[in-house]
């Protein structure tokens, strides 16, 4: 269950907000509230809840530029119902980081006027399939998660 807790030091926008460290930076900040709710309902792991700077290798530069352009135009990408499959045989080369960058960018574009609705999901396919399997033998909240998939705008698998 979602519980709102304001912490200005954990604000996603403190580096760009003119109200940070002023008396206007307080628990009633709608931007913080909405973004906090979007992050919570998306299930993005804590380690990915803040955007990380990536530096492309020369062999990945074209892919990096493509993904960066897509991130900059995430609203139109989502509105068009597009899909993207980021894959590699290797670990640690930024696939998950890029996926969460898309979610974070999307959330930063749509928070105003969102009305505290879930708008994106970060799903570990392995964990989802395991939860579905477990649901056959016990009660768990996998159905709540499955019900969200067709409702939100953006799903990262």
List where the protein language model places each region:
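Residue-level preference for the first positions of well-ordered beta-strands
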Residues: 81-85, 119-120, 154
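Phosphate-binding P-loop
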Residues: 72-82
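Conserved nucleotide-sensing/catalytic segment adjacent to the nucleotide-binding pocket
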Residues: 130-157
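A short hydrophobic beta-strand->loop->alpha-helix junction that borders the nucleotide-binding pocket
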Residues: 117-133
């Amino acid at each position: 269950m979602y519980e709102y807790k304001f912490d200005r030091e954990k604000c996603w926008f403190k580096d760009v907000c003119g109200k940070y460290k002023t008396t206007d930076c307080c628990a009633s900040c709608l931007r913080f509230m909405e973004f906090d709710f979007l992050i919570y309902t998306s299930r993005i792991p804590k380690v990915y809840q803040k955007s990380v700077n990536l530096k492309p290798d020369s062999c990945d530069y074209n892919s990096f530029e493509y993904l960066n352009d897509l991130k900059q135009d995430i609203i139109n990408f989502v509105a068009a119902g597009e899909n993207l499959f980021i894959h590699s045989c290797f670990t640690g080369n930024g696939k998950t980081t890029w996926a969460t960058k898309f979610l974070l960018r999307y959330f930063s574009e749509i928070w105003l006027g969102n009305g505290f609705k879930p708008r994106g999901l970060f799903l570990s396919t392995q964990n989802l399939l395991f939860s579905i399997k477990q649901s056959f033998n016990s009660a768990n909240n996998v159905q709540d998660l499955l019900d969200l998939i067709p409702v939100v705008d953006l799903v990262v698998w």
